[in-house]
Amino acid sequence: MGVFTYETEFTSVIPPPRLFKAFILDADNLIPKIAPQAVKCAEIVEGDGGVGTIKKITFGEGSQFGSVTHKIDGIDKENFVYSYSLVEGDALSDKIEKISYETKLVASSDGGSVIKSTSNYHTKGDVEIKEEHVKAGKEKASHLFKLVEDYLLANPNEYC
């Protein structure tokens, strides 16, 4: 099994505490509300929403995938770090065993946030992950992030 790591960085004018509440802690409610074409719904299959919780994410009709299941590996509300692993679903091919993600929000000097995301693709055998595959996923994540940021800017009293 090989592991391929990719890192991404975004910036936002939204401070980490507010962005973490919306983009991480309440994503299961907010994203289907503002981007139903991307995510139809999210439901807890097992657990209480904390570490170890298993969630099923059903994608919207505009997605190339039907659903995925992920397991929450870590939530650090004080340092704004969230990690989870994609463990099941049609986004995983016969070449990928799982994908682990870590998102960390860091305060920027202008009062906003720097969002640092690390993706670890755990492959079956000696398979290599093509950059195009990763780039497409990064673009979708960037688009969802921008929608959340726009929502927070338009609704300054939410997630305070």
Curated annotation (Swiss-Prot):
- Keywords in alphabetical order: Allergen, Hydrolase, Nuclease, Pathogenesis-related protein, Plant defense
Query: Mind telling me which CDD domains this protein's record contains?
Result: Bet_v1-like
Q: Can you tell which superkingdom this protein's organism belongs to?
A: Eukaryota
Q: Which Pfam families match?
A: Bet_v_1
**Gene3D superfamilies under this entry?**
3.30.530.20
The question of whether Hydrolase is a record keyword is answered with: yes
Question: Where in the body, by tissue, does this protein show up?
Answer: Highly expressed in roots. Expressed a low levels in ripe red fruits.
InterPro entries, per database record: Bet_v_I/MLP, Bet_v_I_allergen, Plant_def-hormone_signal, START-like_dom_sf
A GO molecular-function annotation: protein phosphatase inhibitor activity
Record-level GO cellular component terms: cytoplasm; nucleus
Q: EC number(s) per UniProt?
A: 3.1.27.-
**What GO terms describe the biological role, i.e. biological process, of this protein?**
abscisic acid-activated signaling pathway; defense response
Give the function comment from the record.
Possesses ribonuclease activity in vitro.
Protein family (similarity comment): Belongs to the BetVI family.
Give the protein's recorded name: Major strawberry allergen Fra a 1.06
Organism the protein comes from: Fragaria ananassa (Strawberry)
Gene name for this UniProt entry: Fra a 1.06
